[in-house]
Amino acid sequence: MPRRSIPVKLASAQLCEHRVIRIARGFGLSMEIEFKFCIPPERLQAVEAAMRRGAVRRTRLQAHYVDTPGGALAAAGMVLRLRLEGPRWVQTVKAAGDGPLQRWEHNVDLGPQAGGDAPAADPQRHAGTPVGDRLLAVLRDADGPLRESYATDIERLTREMRSGGATVELALDIGRIRAHGADGALREAQVCELELELLRGDVRGLVALAQAWSQRHGLWFSTVSKAERGERLLHGVVAVPAVKAAPVPPSFAGLDGHALQQAAIAHCLAQILPNASEVAAGSSDDEQVHQLRIGLRRLRTALRDLDALAPGLDPAWEAPLVEVFRMLGVRRDRALVLAQAQAALETASAPPVDMGDDANTSDDPGAAVRAPAFQAVLVALIGHGAAPPGPATTPGLDATDARRHLRDRLRRLHRQVLRDGERFDTLDADAQHRVRKRLKRLRYLAEFAAPLFRPKAAARYLARLRPAQDSLGRFNDEAVALALYRARVGQDPRAWFAVGWLQARHAAAGADAQRVLRRLRKKAMPFWRGRKARD
């Protein structure tokens, strides 16, 4: 089935479902924190047995999701659902909140229905609530009446547990999602998930419990909701576009050290988590792998350069992030770099070379992402983003000192890039590679810091960095391709042509990189100078 983009905003609106803002039935406002994990089929029996070691409650949940014929609600990133919970029907509306970590939700308990039939969906039931008024506004200009889009039939096993001063509800969901496509064909997908929701208490207790269950049973974190899976079934979508990094929001300006550190990490996770979810579930899409690697590099920059803003970052997080980044890079080198090199060599009338296509193909990106060590870091980072500041004895930097710290970091990286750019041709291969990595760090840190200084000047600065990063990227790709062909010389002597040809291209790419790097001294004007925070 061909790739199709989902004609909805659910993919972006539900990037990080671990944090949710919910309006309860009494219209009260509360913060809900939850983790959702996918369960490998071979581990389901063990998970269910572990659930049953305490008092459990079994509930059958039959839900009907409705929308207009043109998908007005899905396009607005909203969900309207009728769900039978035991003997009672509940109507729920959900919508994206102010950011990728938030969601509005309002529930109306309709009670048992005569005859057991599902009640009709009525958007007016949510009138007078923020999300309800938004629902009515979307439907006001809709293209037709509400009708069922897809349905779920879930057996839920729930259990409450105590962990580190927290009360957590565990919900094991097993069942199916069903949707009829435009051609009338019935499409189904299995559901096998474990959700952990903080009912009350310290979020660190939830994180510890999520760590324990995910590590013990080989679970992996997923951002893909049942609603999004239903939309995919409805539209026959089997692959979704990779998620790129969103622009850093102006709200970063004025944040103290702890809040800025949390915001930057959350911004990185908003790119990492949806791509990691797809790859862990079996996607081999090269762009998803590529964007996941970009997100990991941005995250490592945040962890390294924002560490001094506030306590709480664990140095042990670095190693699993580096390992997954490296393993995914092996795939990229063969999938992208080799394809580009082969196309260029073919144009140059090079003889075909047996590149041993079976080499490294055993490296499964999904297995790398599902690795317990990597999943443990994701859970810890999600928990860090939801945790309140630490004790008063270890406060983070205030907004002024946080801004000063970023300015010092930017100044240092900027000077290092300029210094090494002047002598790029004299550096060895490892040092040249460090220049490329340092330039990326400078770019990502500049993106995080832009709202704190002069955003327009920062945009100009970043635009000046881009040609240098592109040039160093080409230089690196030439080096990778050269190494791949050099490694094949023993198996196929025809690779010598490629080695010589690529060696010449690599030298030319290095000269171009030095020229572009030297231009930065005059072109890339630091935006962090001066006291003004804005243009």
Q: Can you describe what each PLM-predicted range is?
A:
Residues 3-4, 19-25:
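Basic polycationic patches enriched in arginine
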Residues 8, 20-22, 30:
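Residue-level detector of intrinsically disordered terminal segments
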Residues 26-535:
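Function-determining surface determinants
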